Regions:
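Active-site segments that bind and position negatively charged phosphate/pyrophosphate groups
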Residues: 97-220
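A glycine/threonine-rich phosphate-anchoring loop and its flanking beta-alpha core
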Residues: 2-104, 202
Length: 221
């Protein structure tokens, strides 16, 4: 869309942040995997095979789809690996905005936690029932809501370090995005944990039902 609407320049410049797009042709989306949230987001990512660089563009409503047709049945034939990697991507779109070191809004936290609980619950169903329409529908809708800006309200926009790191891995090694994120997040979490252990304790309790202790490190060690 950016390339067609801005023919005077190399579209890669938008991803290098050396130029800013001024237009985009209207886009419609038909998701064939629940993962990226592109069907409702204002961001996009491409890989340049000249150097194997993976970059995201400047977030803009210009490239937000004008309409989306969402049919969970289109996801039935996905391999288990792609289905579960997609679920990780959805979780991470929420978690990148959830794990911030500022005071957040209770309602946004509740929305984010509900999304994460829904994805985890239904991802387990799909391990045994890949053709479960309701589970596919829940995850597809969660994927849209996780990356349309809703879960970033009152969070300062999010951290996004894990996504930036994964883009480097994905560009160099052609790693499935969700799989790369799952490999990175644990190390990132340990690195930032001491900055806000209360946040990790809240996550452990509200998402995984780990009993809450006054000592945050006992809840989320």
């Amino acid at each position: 869309g950016y390339g067609v609407a801005n023919p005077w320049t190399d579209v890669w410049n938008f991803f290098l942040k050396t130029e800013v797009p001024t237009a985009c042709i209207p886009i419609g989306a038909i998701p064939t995997i629940a993962a990226s949230g592109s069907e409702m987001s204002g961001s996009c990512v491409i890989t340049n095979e000249d150097g194997w660089l993976k970059r995201g563009s400047t977030r803009s409503d210009l490239c937000r789809p004008k309409f989306t047709l969402m049919n969970p049945r289109l996801n039935y034939t996905l391999p288990e690996y792609q289905t579960e990697s997609g679920c990780v991507d959805i979780l991470m779109h929420t978690m990148e905005r959830y794990f911030v070191n500022i005071e957040t809004m209770e309602i946004t936290d509740s929305i984010s936690e509900s999304l994460m609980q829904t994805v985890i619950y239904n991802a387990r169903i799909l391990l045994n029932e890949p053709g479960n329409y309701n589970a596919r529908a829940e995850i597809m809708w969660a994927g849209s809501l996780s990356h349309n800006g809703l879960t970033g309200c009152g969070t300062g926009g999010g951290d996004w370090a894990c996504h930036q790191l994964e883009h480097e891995l994905g560009g160099m090694f052609d790693v499935t995005h969700g799989a790369g994120l799952s490999a990175i997040w644990g190390s990132w979490a340990r690195y930032v944990y001491d900055a806000n252990p209360e946040r990790f304790a809240q996550f452990a309790t509200n998402i995984f039902d780990i009993p809450y202790f006054a000592d945050y490190e006992s809840t989320a060690p």
